[in-house]
Regions:
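Non-catalytic, mostly N-terminal accessory regions of nucleic-acid modification and defense proteins
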Residues: 1-196, 255-268, 361-364, 386-402, ...
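Short, contiguous acidic/charged loop-to-helix segments that flank catalytic cores in large enzymes
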Residues: 29, 288-308, 334-343, 363-369, ...
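Hydrophobic alpha-helical scaffolding
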Residues: 128, 150, 204, 232-236, ...
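Conserved S-adenosyl-L-methionine
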Residues: 175-279, 284-288, 293-300, 312, ...
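Hydrophobic alpha-helix feature that most strongly marks membrane-spanning transmembrane helices
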Residues: 219, 248, 252, 282, ...
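Active-site lining segments that contact anionic ligands and/or coordinate catalytic metals
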Residues: 273-274, 298, 308-310, 324-326, ...
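C-terminal, active-site-flanking charged/polar segments
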Residues: 355-356, 366-418
Length: 504
């Protein structure tokens, strides 16, 4: 999900890059959004084929003749791959002119046998723009993958899928990166919320990153992935399909609705009350259908402005919370202080309802797609510290991993989640410039503005032990030397200009 991915195994990262480089060769004259489905579709096809083959060999060895019995596979969550669609048959035709049609037919056959995949898999490999010789080379590369060398097959293909998603997001930039939330941002939300069991919901789920990280969290803490149930929605049909494939690779069975749909105008989970809601909605979405939703039951704290959906997203999520539910979401910083279109009043009402548990101001340059500064909002219907809100200023955190991109390190994420834990436990002490706890009265005095900088203050400078008088004597002496040096340089420049006939 991230270029320098969470839980990366340095021995394996070259493999992901190898796949990506092959994908770049495939691109030819396709644009990124088109070849995205080609590459991700191939990864998915290889994944389900390999899972099927493992089980097929196991059944063959048992010798009871059940290797073509679809129930033997579906009962273990394995997709059934019919004759004609198996990777060995695709590999055998890798360098024939009809390889694109062979893959398209395989995708159709797999969809037909597996209802969960209906209308989800890409079937555009036969198109003339796709170089069939290069496509055959990529099929060869996938055929020759030695999974044993690369650790768990599910993990390596899942990570490859995520790696390619991140690279597509970087390439597409503002035009197409909305489907992707950087891993370090998702992991921060997950590490604070700790979704061990219950219903997890993302109303704008993109490619499913929140769900993948939630499942990883459960697995990393020796939990059972079946203890969480996944609900999501996305309005973009291509992205919705990518999420379905991404989650299937991870062995996660989500309910993403029966089709891609607009969350505000066509809520696919109207009765859902979730235990954990995690989301990175589109920032400052302007045309969100406000005129059709004026009396909507979700706007408990005020009608969101037609020109900005930020508080529509927040209220939609609050509406879908279970009585003990919690939210972790990304919002543009404008939402911390905006007074326009009634946003100030909505924010005031949400604060006075004692729902805002924590605000984290995030560093810049975390996203491929925008330079808009963002914060994380954590909402809790049953706060352990009633009447209090934690403010964390994390703007100085993170490490630049490229000229344009910053990431939070594991230590950064741990520091944020540990600070939150200490606040919940009642053991947190304010740290100037980093974290502070404020009660509702203090927030009211600040006109209900939630910018952490207003509450955490300025970081204390370390005392270097040098007495003030001595420091001033030293600094003024150094300054005097610099002035003298500057006069010498000025005289030298005047002399040199005079020598060539230019007097100053």
């Amino acid at each position: 999900m991230d270029i320098a991915m969470a839980e990366k195994n340095t021995a394996d990262i070259g493999f992901e890059k190898q796949i990506w480089n092959a994908a770049c060769v495939l691109r030819g004259n396709l644009d990124a959004s088109e070849y995205k489905s080609v590459v991700l579709g191939l990864i998915f096809l290889k994944y389900i084929s390999d899972r099927f083959n493992d089980k097929y060999r196991e059944l063959l060895a048992e010798g009871d003749g059940f290797e073509e019995d679809i129930d033997e596979y579906t009962s273990e969550g394995i997709f059934f791959v019919p004759v004609g669609a198996r990777w060995s048959e695709i590999a055998a035709k890798a360098h024939t002119p009809e390889i694109g049609t062979v893959i398209d037919d395989a995708m159709r056959a797999i969809e037909k046998e597996n209802k969960r995949l209906k209308d989800i898999l890409p079937k555009n490999f036969a198109r003339p723009e796709l170089d069939k010789r290069r496509l055959g080379d990529v099929v060869d590369l996938f055929t020759n993958i030695q999974m044993i060398e690369h650790g768990s097959e599910k993990d390596i293909l899942g990570r490859t899928y995520e790696y390619c998603l991140s690279m597509f997001a970087e390439q597409e930039g503002k035009r197409g990166g909305e489907f992707f939330t950087p891993s370090c941002v998702v992991r921060t939300l997950v590490e604070v919320l700790k979704p061990f069991k219950g219903r997890v919901y993302d109303p704008c789920c993109g490619s499913g990153g929140m769900f993948v990280q939630s499942a990883k969290f459960v697995e990393n803490h020796s939990g059972n992935i079946s203890n969480i149930s996944i609900y999501g929605q996305d309005s973009n049909p291509t992205t919705w399909k990518m999420a379905q494939m991404n989650l299937a690779i991870r062995g996660i069975e989500p309910d993403l609705g029966t089709y891609a749909a607009d969350t505000f105008l066509d809520d696919r989970h109207p009765t859902l009350r979730a235990d954990y809601i995690m989301a990175n909605p589109p920032f400052n979405l302007s045309d969100w259908g406000a005129d059709k939703l004026k009396e909507d039951v979700r706007w408990q704290y005020g009608m969101p402005p037609a020109g900005n959906a930020n508080f529509a997203w927040l209220q939609h999520m609050i509406y879908h919370l279970a009585p003990t539910g919690r939210i972790g979401m990304v919002l543009a910083n404008g939402s911390l202080s905006s007074q326009s279109g009634g946003e100030g009043e909505i924010r005031k009402n949400i604060i006075n309802a004692d729902l805002v548990e924590c605000i984290v101001a995030m560093p810049t340059q975390l996203f491929y797609t925008t330079q808009i500064p963002v914060s994380l909002w954590f909402i809790n219907k049953q706060k352990k510290q009633p009447g209090k809100t934690l403010f964390i200023d994390a703007r100085k955190m993170g490490t630049m991993v490229s000229r344009k991109l910053r990431e939070l390190t594991d230590d950064d994420i741990k520091k944020i989640s540990d600070t939150y834990e200490a606040f919940v436990d009642g053991t947190l002490e304010d740290v100037k410039g980093f974290c502070a706890v404020a009660d509702t009265e203090e927030i009211e005095k600040q006109d209900y503005i939630l910018a952490p900088g207003r509450y955490v203050g300025i970081e204390e400078q370390e005392d270097d032990g040098e007495p003030f008088e001595e420091k001033m004597d030293r600094l003024t002496s150094e300054l005097s030397e610099m002035f003298a040096k500057s006069h010498e340089l000025e005289d030298e420049i005047r002399r040199k200009l005079g020598a060539i006939g230019y007097e100053i």
